Curated annotation (Swiss-Prot):
Domain GST N-terminal: 3-83
Top-tier EC class: transferase
GO CC, any one term: cytoplasm
Keyword Metal-binding: no
Protein name: Glutathione S-transferase
UniProt KW keywords: Cytoplasm, Transferase
Chief location bin: cytoplasm
Role, per record: Conjugation of reduced glutathione to a wide number of exogenous and endogenous hydrophobic electrophiles.
Subunit structure comment from the entry: Homodimer.
C-alpha cells in the first residue's frame, strides 16, 4: 500500500493551499513537512528534490512532483475529479484558470504596501463581482446542475469554493448579487470531506499574520 502524499511547503496557504483543498475534498489523508527556515528550503534544493528549485513539492506515487498546476492536474485525474472526457476537462481547466487568476491577486496582498494593498482590495472585489462571479453564476444557471461541469463534483467546484471563501475574507457580502453562487457555496461546504476540511483543527491554513509574512520573506529572500 502506497504511503500518504507528503506536502513540502511553508505553514502558509500560498500555492500549496489549493493542493491541500483538492486532496482533502478527495478524502485523501496527507502529511506535511513544513519549510520553517531558509536552510530547510536549501536542503530540498541541494538534495535534488526540487526539479526547478521551487516549492510546492508533493511526494506522491513515488514521484517528487513540482509545479502546482501539474500537481493539481495529477490529483484531479487520480481521484476522478477531472471530468469524464476531454471536453469536460477543457471546461474544468477554463473555470480553474479563472479562479486561479482571482486567488493569485488575493495571495499577493499580504506582501504589498498598505496604500497599494487598499487599492488592490478594491480592484479584486470589483473584478470578482464583474468579471469572475458572473461567469460562474451563469454557468450554474445554464448548466442546471448542482455542479459547474457534468453531474458530479469536480476540481472546478472545489477551486471555486476556495476562491469564494477567500474573497469573503475581504468582503463578507461579496456574493450578495449571486444567489446561485450562494446556494452553491452552501452545497459544497456540506460535502462531507469538504465540511471536515472547513472545521477548526484541519490542515486548512489561515490567512498570513505579520510574523508569518516576515518568515516567508526570510525563507524566499524577497
Amino acid at each position: 500500500m502506497a504511503g500518504k502524499p507528503k506536502l513540502h511547503y511553508t505553514r502558509g496557504r500560498g500555492k500549496m493551499e489549493s493542493i491541500r483543498w483538492l486532496l482533502a475534498a478527495a478524502g485523501v489523508e496527507f502529511e506535511e513537512e513544513f519549510i520553517e527556515k531558509k536552510e530547510d528550503l536549501e536542503k530540498l534544493r541541494n538534495d535534488g528534490s526540487l526539479l526547478f528549485q521551487q516549492v510546492p513539492m508533493v511526494e506522491i506515487d513515488g514521484m517528487k512532483m513540482v509545479q502546482s498546476r501539474a500537481i493539481l492536474c495529477y490529483i484531479a485525474g487520480k481521484y476522478n475529479l477531472y471530468g469524464k472526457d476531454l471536453k469536460e476537462r477543457a471546461w474544468i481547466d477554463m473555470y480553474v484558470e479563472g479562479t486561479t487568476d482571482l486567488m493569485g491577486m488575493i495571495m499577493a496582498l499580504p506582501f504589498q504596501a498598505a496604500d497599494v494593498k487598499e487599492k488592490n482590495i478594491a480592484l479584486i472585489t470589483e473584478r470578482a463581482t464583474t468579471r469572475y462571479f458572473p461567469v460562474y453564476e451563469k454557468a450554474l444557471k445554464d448548466h442546471g446542475q448542482d455542479y459547474l461541469v457534468g453531474n458530479k463534483l469536480s476540481w472546478a467546484d472545489i477551486h471555486l469554493l476556495e476562491a469564494i471563501l477567500m474573497t469573503e475574507e475581504l468582503k463578507s457580502d461579496i456574493l450578495s448579487a449571486f444567489p446561485l453562487l450562494q446556494a452553491f457555496k452552501g452545497r459544497m461546504s456540506n460535502v462531507p470531506t469538504i465540511k471536515k476540511f472547513l472545521q477548526p483543527g484541519s490542515q486548512r491554513k489561515p490567512p498570513l499574520d505579520e510574523k508569518s509574512i516576515a518568515n516567508v520573506r526570510k525563507i524566499f529572500s524577497f
